[in-house]
């Protein structure tokens, strides 16, 4: 039923071909949340980063309170490397973020 509709965006940014790492970002429209689109898109982007772009490491930043996103990232093998205090500003206050990453050698599809 959602065919041919834009449900969100996934992108690889800050691509560094020397150090072979990049940042991954994903946003799914709220009305499509919980339907598996985030996991599907995330898997495809990870495969592209590792197999086509030959990245060694993919990383991301996530709101420390976003348990749903953290669960998806952990299910894909991402591990928390650190907590960044008051990393971003939203809705009138600063929020903490986790820095998470996945190494190609640790990725299992």
Predicted segments with their positions:
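Glycine-rich acetyl-CoA-binding "A-motif" of GNAT/NAT acetyltransferases
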Residues: 4-8, 68, 94
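Short glycine/proline-centered loop/turn elements that form peptide/ligand docking sites
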Residues: 38, 42, 65-69, 86-91
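Conserved active-site tyrosine of GNAT-family acetyltransferases
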Residues: 73, 78, 100
């Amino acid at each position: 039923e959602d065919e041919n509709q834009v449900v969100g965006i996934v992108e690889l940014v800050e691509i560094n071909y020397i150090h072979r790492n990049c940042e991954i970002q994903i946003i799914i429209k709220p009305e499509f949340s919980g339907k598996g689109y985030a996991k599907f898109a995330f898997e495809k982007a990870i495969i592209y980063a590792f197999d086509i772009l030959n990245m060694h490491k993919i990383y991301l930043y996530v709101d420390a309170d976003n348990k749903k996103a953290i669960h998806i990232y952990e299910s894909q093998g991402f591990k928390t490397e650190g907590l960044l205090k008051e990393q971003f500003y939203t809705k009138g206050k600063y929020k903490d973020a986790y820095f998470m990453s996945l190494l190609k050698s640790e990725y299992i599809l």
